[in-house]
Amino acid sequence: MSIEELCALPVAELAAKDSALFMWATFPQLPEALRLIRAWGFTYKSVAFVWLKKNRKADSWFYGLGFWTRANAEVCLLATKGHPKRQAADIHQLIISPIEAHSKKPDETRDKIVALMGDLPRVELFARQTSPGWDVWGNEVEATIPDFGTSCPKLEVTD
């Protein structure tokens, strides 16, 4: 999806009056992530989590190719709409976890979000899998929010 198509998603209408948005972003795409936060009616607050990537089969750091330097970390931005309440003050920002499938984020992130915000209604957009307690929407899962008002383009499979 293009940035314009992403900005047009009705996230502002889906989100509760007092809600939090957690958005993964790579460093080269930070300007687009911040644009998307504003388009969806949220205000950027902080970097909620920093994922330091380990190799899957060795106790060493994973390094991608990067644009300027060999990249490792990804950030999960935190933005809010209204005045959501933090439920815990002991949630650490760092997530040290091995890489898994391409673009799959660490599962522990969901647990940290629930601990931080409480057991509230929540949805994962562009989900790669279903998770207990989470509604999902994306081209790799059966959506649990069919009234989202748009469809996620299906992955094109090539031989």
PLM feature segments, named:
Residues M1-D159:
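Class I S-adenosyl-L-methionine-dependent methyltransferase catalytic core
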